[in-house]
Amino acid sequence: MDYLVQSVPSKSGLASPERYREDVVEEPLTERGRRSRERIVDAAAALVAERGAGGARLDQILEAAGASKSQLYHYFSDKEDLVRAVIARRVGETVHCQGPQLDKVDSLAALRRWFDWLVDQNAERDCPGCPLGALASELADCDEAARGDLTCGFDTWIGYVIEGIERMKVSGELDERADPRRLGVAVFASLQGGLLLSKTYKDPQYLRDALDATYDHFLSLRAHHPGAPKRPPG
C-alpha cells in the first residue's frame, strides 16, 4: 500500500509533496472500518513512541487496540506496512502543527517567534525529542520503504522552512548571500540536533542554544537598512 503521494521536484531542489496523505490507497469503505483502522494505528503509534518500531509487538498493538489479527491483516499487509501508517500519522501531525506556524514566517522577527515557540513547546512537554527523528534513527538503515516515507515527510517540513526564508529574502530582510535551500536545511538540522540533545540531557536549553546560534547566522545575512531587527537579549 502507498501512504504518500509522489514527491515532485521543487525549486528548492528538495522533493516537495503537494500534500502528505495519512490515508491509504485502499481506504476502508465503511465508517466502522475506518474507525477500526484508526484504533490500530493509534495503538501502534503509542507503542512505537514508547518502545520503538522494533520493540512494539503486533500482539501488544492488537491488545491495546482491542482488535483481532484478521482486522489487522485486512488493513495492513504486515508489520512494516503498519509502521508506514504510523510514519504517515506522525508526519500528518507534524505538518498540521508546524505548517500554520511556518506560514507566518516572513521576517526575522517572525523567525525568532517560531524559534521561541519551538523551545517553549519542547520545555512544556519535558523534552520528548522528535518522533520522526526517532523513527529515522531506527529505520533509515533497515527499511527502505520507511526511509522513503520519512525523507518525503522531512522534505515537506523543510519545504515550509524554505518558503518562509524565501519570503524573507523577497521582502528585502536578507541579502543576496542568503540561500533559502541551504538555510532551510541548516535550520532543520539545528532543530533536530537540538531536540535530540534536549531529550538526552532533559534540558530545553540545548534546543535554545542551537536555534539561537542559527538565528545569529540569519542576522549576519540581513540586509543593511534602517530598522533591521537585532537579536533580542536573553
PLM regions and their residue ranges:
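N-terminal intrinsically disordered/low-complexity leader segments
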Residues: M1-R35, H224-G234
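Hydrophobic alpha-helical segments that form the core
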Residues: D2-L4, G133, A178-L197, A213-H217
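Helix-turn-helix
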Residues: R39, A43, L47-D81, A85
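Hydrophobic alpha-helical connector segments
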Residues: A85, Q98-P128, P180-V187
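Short, basic, alpha-helical segments at the C-terminal edge of helix-turn-helix-like DNA-binding modules
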Residues: A88-T94
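Amphipathic alpha-helical segments used for helix-helix packing
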Residues: A109-A110, E124-A145
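Amphipathic C-terminal alpha-helical segment
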Residues: Q121, R167, F188-Q205, H217-G227
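Hydrophobic alpha-helical bundle segments that form small-molecule/ligand-binding pockets
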Residues: C142-E144, D155-L183, F218-R231
